[in-house]
């Protein structure tokens, strides 16, 4: 969790970070493989998801 940084003026909640790391660990990822947890809205990611869903 040392890679957690402030985004949009707010520090990420430790509970939220713990849940995300736990979910990724349950999927087989180690904590060393997690580079960033960024709560940034990216409209490009949304559009890419929509385009992939239409395929």
Curated annotation (Swiss-Prot):
Record field: catalytic activity: (S)-methylmalonyl-CoA + Na(+)(in) + H(+)(out) = propanoyl-CoA + Na(+)(out) + CO2
EC number(s) from the headed UniProt entry: 7.2.4.3
GO CC field: plasma membrane
Keyword terms: Cell membrane, Ion transport, Membrane, Sodium, Sodium transport, Translocase, Transport
Biological process annotations from GO: sodium ion transport
Catalytic class of the enzyme: translocase
Regulation: Completely inhibited by avidin.
Disruption phenotype: Deletion of the gene does not abolish methylmalonyl-CoA-decarboxylase or Na(+) transport activity, but it affects the stability of the complex, especially the binding of the alpha subunit. Mutant lacking this gene plus the 3'-terminal half of the mmdD gene lacks methylmalonyl-CoA decarboxylase activity.
Primary site of residence: membrane
Subcellular location: Cell membrane
Keyword Transferase: no
Keyword Metal-binding on entry: no
Function (record text): Subunit of the sodium ion pump methylmalonyl-CoA decarboxylase, which converts the chemical energy of a decarboxylation reaction into an electrochemical gradient of Na(+) ions across the cytoplasmic membrane, thereby creating a sodium ion motive force that is used for ATP synthesis. The epsilon subunit seems not important for the catalysis of either decarboxylation or Na(+) transport, but it improves binding of the alpha subunit and plays an important role in stabilizing the methylmalonyl-CoA-decarboxylase enzyme complex. Can also convert malonyl-CoA into acetyl-CoA.
Subunit-structure text: The methylmalonyl-CoA decarboxylase is composed of five subunits: the carboxyltransferase alpha subunit (MmdA), the tunnel beta subunit (MmdB), the biotin-containing gamma subunit (MmdC), and the delta (MmdD) and epsilon (MmdE) subunits.
Protein name (record): Methylmalonyl-CoA decarboxylase subunit epsilon
High-level lineage: Bacteria, Bacillati, Bacillota, Negativicutes, Veillonellales
